[in-house]
Amino acid sequence: MVALSMKLPFALATAFTAIPLVFGGSLSDVKHVVYFMQENRAFDHYFGTMSGVRGFKDPNVHVDEKGTPVWYQPTTNSEAEYLLPFYLGANPAYKNGSQCAVGGSNDWTENHNAWNYGKINGWITNNSQYAWGHYDRSDIPTHFAVAEEWSVADMYAEFVIGPTAPNRASWISGTLNFDSQVGAPEEIGGPYMENWSTHECEYTDGVPFNCYPLKWMTMPELLEAQNISWFVYRDSDSTNDDPMYYFQNYLDSPSDGPLAVKGLSYEGFPLFIEQASNGTLPEVSWIIGSFPLSEHPPHTPTSGAWMIEKTIEVITQGPLANDTVLFISYDETGGWGDHVPPFVSPNGTAYEWALNPLTQKEYWPVGPGFRVPFFAVSPWTRGGSVFSEPSDHSSQLLFLEEWAAAQGKDVKLDAIAPWRRSHMSNLVNMFDFEHPRFDIPTLANVSFPAWSDGAYIATTICQEENKGYTQPPIPYGNQTLQDALWAEEGYKHLRGALTEGRYVVFSQKWKQGTYAIGKYKSSDNIHSLSTASNFSGERYRFIVYQVGDAFSKEFYIQSVFGEYLTHSGRFASTKAKADIFSINYTASKGYTIKSPAGQYLGTSPYGGITWTDQKSYFDVVSVTYNDE
């Protein structure tokens, strides 16, 4: 392992940034794609308190058959019937030590039991009492800054409801071979659902599973066949996180063969820094960082933040800044809880549901699983937008297929199952190729992680300096819903197909100012209302309800005051009396709202709304304010 002691000032004035004279305005402008996957954090665990995302202020929160919101997780503790989300650093004595706190289990069984057939009521009873713990901005300022300066996805999920290895295998191959999708397990490997690295199969009642190594096709092999340059930047202590090591073709590759040289070398993060700085990165890169910097509990978010900042720094300040996309993701939740039900396929969908390999009894979905943090850093994702399309690790592969096609190359990973291919986002809508921004923001400027005798020691220091104060007391019986679901106030602009889970403002810009559709509390009519600069007014705040599943583009639109929109321009008291509207997204333009009569809704700067045959595009803003 090599210490990365270099530290450059992150901020760089726009005046010193290279700005091209002509914007290409398409996916073909991307010449370099960098994939960087960290470890074991859930979306709510990191971003539940962030404004403008599907977090603790979710107006469409899942409820059980009794009407109890998912926030109320049942417990077996005598002090409290339920546990609400809680801030890990609430007690000042535990504030620093909570950086190296540990959550629950990331295993297949525990996380499926937390899912509990869609009830999402087993995080505490079936996983860990710490599963409902979370951080806020003060603990992870870099992560908040990346989300707010570039783009964060709040509907991005782990590929499988399970641990690290299968999620990372899916990250480069798009399958885990459930239902023998790509071949018989004893011949080709899988179904891969646990952190298993013994060169044999496991069996339950004679049925094989976790057959290892894996022998199906991976994305780097397809890139190699198309003469697309690629490399895996893997540090020496990260073998278990490098999915290339799970696959037989890489293990069998001659030491001087492309799969071994590019996929299994120990040319880690220092080489990435060098090549990003001098402009010699391959077209596609994978970063597998040092394990102590991976954010895998108890390794600290702060240590991982340094590596995130350094990666962004060398890309955005290097010669490839204007044509590079960096995706930062997390493999799985690490046993930290998330409140959004996984958007799994219909029961019985081919390759997506299976008998639990460990018991051959329960019939469970493979995934997609619970939400994890996901960012896109590029000139086309600047500005702090929220990407709302359902996505998972296969989405990164689907993006690469689209990107390769834009470069004139034919890359298609056939192992991606039909349902995933047709339902998971390819991430292209995350980008606004017509309006790139080449200015570079300032991040938190995290210090280099503590290092001694050839090893990172920040985790050890955290544990020793805060001995007895890393796992805060669980606040059983000492919570209020208002405190538990506290979130920052503010707003973010949405991109991508609209989904539930946010208070939204439908706004349009006119030369007279910004106007939004709205409703006065005392009126039954829709109006066009001038908005505040922070979109804080209740009168133009709405909740949308998808008709169908998380992939539907049909919605009921409800005023924050409770009534539902109709095509007549009036509001109805119930859904039964309301109309269903089609809401569609077009990249670089925005959202259209189409009535059942086929007309498009629009605003005007004169107080009235319009219904016309011409598309009228809205900017949809996700807002979080504590008057909700």
What is each of the regions a protein language model found here?
Residues 22-513, 518-598, 602-628:
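N-terminal pro-sequences and low-complexity stem/linker regions of secreted or lumenal proteins
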Residues 1-24:
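Fungal secretory targeting signals
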